Regions:
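ACP-dependent fatty acid/polyketide chain-elongation machinery
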Residues: 1-66, 243-252, 350-364, 408-410
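Condensing-enzyme catalytic core mediating Claisen C-C bond formation in acyl metabolism
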Residues: 4-8, 31-36, 213-289, 297-298
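Conserved beta-ketoacyl condensing-enzyme motif
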Residues: 7, 22-23, 31-161, 190-199, ...
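Conserved small-residue
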Residues: 9, 27, 81, 102, ...
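Active-site-proximal alpha-helical scaffold in enzymes
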Residues: 77-90, 139-150, 156-191, 229-250, ...
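Phosphate/pyrophosphate-binding loops at sites that engage ATP/ADP/AMP, CoA/4′-phosphopantetheine
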Residues: 84-96, 245-250, 282-298, 320-324
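Glycine-/small-residue-rich "gating" segment that lines the acyl/pantetheine channel
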Residues: 123-130, 171, 175, 192-247, ...
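Short glycine/threonine-rich loop-to-helix capping motif typified by GTGT followed
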Residues: 266-275, 304-321, 340-347, 380
Length: 410
């Protein structure tokens, strides 16, 4: 018999708030976390706007020595993990640590560290790069450091599926508990690659918005959209087997009931134009949850703000939900946070859990010009109340990776 899996802790670091409560309260009122880049001089950069995390101090959770030895994406992950763990109320001394695992994703890992050490090697010699270069930059280090911090000694893995990474991480952790391999999992994602190399790489492939107006840069589903805005941050969830959580008197924030994954198997970066790949993962998630499409009331869309993605995701929703697609409330919180790449699915999972808890769909800010090719029931500029037990969060990534998660209100 498959076991139930619930959420007992959430943590977040995002461009619209440090801490999950701060982030959610700001999301509800449509706070924009997108502004001009401050982390490097953009004079020679075509793209000058991003969703930076402002006011983050890693020394709130670690000493100065550890902060110097740890990449920014890992710092974000550790902060979010600590928040989620504290909220869960878990006492590791009372747990079988081999039944507590970690699955925390990152799409790119410590890219700013790689850039910095490459420049150092070019200037001096490569024997003089930092001895911490490799351990601080590798993508799995956020997961490893969380395991160390929390004392979780079970499975510790890192999913890398581009912008679907965090959703795949949560989905894998969900199945791992449901199928009996673990009782507790810390899962989610972390990303921080707002640097010359990161911005330049995505800019050169015409993926980023080159708008010079922060309020019109990340505009998912708007007819004038012209690319995504890079964001940074982390979202971490503590998942637990239902009876395990009830036995210790944990507060349950929500339930994970479905996960679907598919691949377009079509192109390195472009989604299938007919939306069939993304539709497949939504359908698989619905089937995994054992519910009907009409039972879902809200979708936190992938909604990046690129011309192809939003058009394709619209088609996918229509394929997966049929007539019910006309009734579904849909928003893209990337309009506020920017696109956190491998961490986006985790931040958006937190948003979806909070949306279900409060029965409130956050807005898609900056939405002005409707697009006939994106004719879904978008929540434009203001949030909307809804009444539904179930909500979905979608993530789609380069390489054709598609992931959908379904959460249930408790």
């Amino acid at each position: 018999m498959k076991r139930r899996v619930v959420v007992t802790g959430i943590g977040a670091v995002s461009p619209i708030g440090i801490g999950s409560s701060n982030m959610w309260e700001n999301a509800k009122v449509g706070k924009l976390g997108i502004d001009f880049i401050t982390q490097f001089d953009t004079e020679e950069s075509k793209v000058k706007i991003a969703g930076e995390v402002k006011g983050f101090d890693p020394c709130e959770i670690m000493d100065k020595m550890e902060a110097r030895r740890t990449a920014r994406f890992t710092q974000f992950a550790l902060y979010a993990a600590e928040e989620a763990f504290k909220q869960s109320g878990l006492d590791i001394s009372k747990e079988d640590t081999l039944r507590c695992g970690v699955n925390v994703a990152s799409g790119i890992g410590g890219l700013p560290v790689i850039q910095r050490e490459c420049l150092r090697g070019d200037k001096h010699c490569y024997d003089r790069v930092s001895p911490l270069f490799v351990p601080s930059s590798i993508t799995n280090m956020a997961a490893g450091m969380i395991a160390i911090k929390l004392g979780f000694k079970g499975s510790c893995t890192c999913v890398v599926t581009a912008c679907a990474s965090a959703s795949d991480s949560i989905g894998a952790a969900f199945h791992y508990i449901r199928d009996g391999y673990s009782d507790v999992m810390a899962c989610g994602g972390a990303e921080s690659c707002i640097c010359e190399l990161g911005i330049g790489g995505f800019s050169s492939m015409k993926a980023l918005s080159d708008s010079d107006d922060p309020t019109r840069a990340s505009i998912p589903f708007d007819k004038e959209r012209n690319g995504f805005v890079m964001g940074e941050g982390s979202g971490i969830l503590i998942l637990e087997e239902y009876e395990h959580a009830v036995k210790r008197g944990a507060k349950i924030l929500g339930e994970v009931v479905g996960y679907g994954a598919s691949c377009d198997a079509n192109h390195m970066t472009a989604p299938l134009e007919d939306g069939s790949g993304a539709a497949a993962c939504m359908t698989l998630a619905i089937r995994d949850a054992g519910i009907e499409p009409c039972e879902i009331g809200y979708i936190n869309a992938h909604g990046t703000g690129t011309p192809l993605n939003d058009k394709g995701e619209t088609k996918a929703v229509k394929l997966a939900f049929g007539e019910h697609s006309k009734e579904l409330l849909i928003s893209s919180t990337k309009s506020m946070t920017g696109h956190l790449l491998g961490a986006s699915g985790a931040i958006e999972a937190v948003m979806t859990i909070k949306a279900l808890e409060e029965q409130f769909a956050p807005p898609t800010v900056g939405y002005k010009v409707p697009d006939e090719n994106c004719d879904l029931k978008i929540c434009p500029n203001e949030g909307v109340d809804f009444d539904s037990e179930y909500a979905m969060s979608n993530s789609l990534g380069f390489g054709g990776h598609n992931a959908s998660l379904i959460f249930k209100r408790v």
